């Protein structure tokens, strides 16, 4: 986001220096905690400012991203019975139970998610990101935990996501009464805003304004969903603002040792941000 922030500030400075007076209000909000719990954006949503149109600066390579999937981090814990490895038939291996759950996710649940293809955003996804459990190799483990990443489309609800995962566990319990698992939100109790999906209509003024600018510049218009979570999900679900994710830089080099951004693209972004403000807000 560093490149988009610089381009946005340059755009605002250019408008100020030009002496142009806008009919509407133009805000820059540099929010903190975007990578963790979104506290900066939550503060802005509660206290303002609120805008009709919002551009969220992320490295889209200057492609227009009118939406992203929702996000839930979910912990599934498995309970077993600890015994010495030499008497493992008397125990219940929690890691083995976890592996059965993971297999069921990929064998049965993923195909279901693939069938829920949504316009622009594509199909919802699930990723088993971490697994931990057990104490030592010679002991049957009585505990195991996986943490998964679940990406949602607008046709799904958060409640539905948890119900479906719990149903997978209940099916395994019916097959084997020894199977026990609990499903919970990783951030349960923190009172965070829900990470809902968002999708802005392609005919919304924030979209048509930028598309018109691209056409006038002879720049190819590429519209695609942003593959990662953005604060646009918070803003669009909690306010009346219409959001567009747009910025210089490539996501594939973000968070990397060799992270970089092309200066030419930053300059282009600053020009497009400024022109968007002029056209969207209008001039007095």
Where are the predicted features?
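Generic detector of well-ordered alpha-helical packing
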Residues: 1, 34-35, 59, 85, ...
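Acidic/histidine-rich catalytic neighborhood of metal-dependent amide-processing enzymes
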Residues: 2-69, 73, 281
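Metal-dependent amide/peptide-bond hydrolase catalytic core
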Residues: 66, 75-284
